[in-house]
Regions:
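Ribonuclease/tRNase effector modules and their secretory precursors
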Residues: 1-99
Length: 99
């Protein structure tokens, strides 16, 4: 899968999301960001949740090899993380087969 998000310049954190992933899923913001720098990184269009803005789902690993699902949108050259959590069983299988 081609990664169209390799040329972003940084991340944008919404005040409402800054601590949400840590509280709900025990995922630090820096862990969410690491997913985009490590390979393999699988990115799919999230057509089910792309209204009103286009969203994507990324499957990738942190530097500590924690496999995460990251829901995000793109704002210019920035990635805005909406949600990050551990992958579920189905997502882990997909990542292992496609990555």
């Amino acid at each position: 899968m081609e990664n169209q998000f390799e040329h972003f310049v940084g991340f944008q954190w919404d005040q409402g999301n800054i601590d949400k992933n840590l509280v709900r899923h025990d995922v630090e913001n820096w862990g969410s960001e690491q997913v985009f720098f490590n390979r393999p990184l699988l990115v799919l269009n999230d057509t089910k949740h792309s209204i009103p803005e286009k969203r994507w789902v990324a499957f990738g690993k942190t530097d500590a090899d924690r496999l995460l699902t990251v829901i995000f949108t793109k704002r210019g050259d920035l990635i805005r993380v909406i949600s990050a959590r551990d992958v579920n069983r189905k997502e882990r299988k997909f990542y292992n087969e496609e990555g």
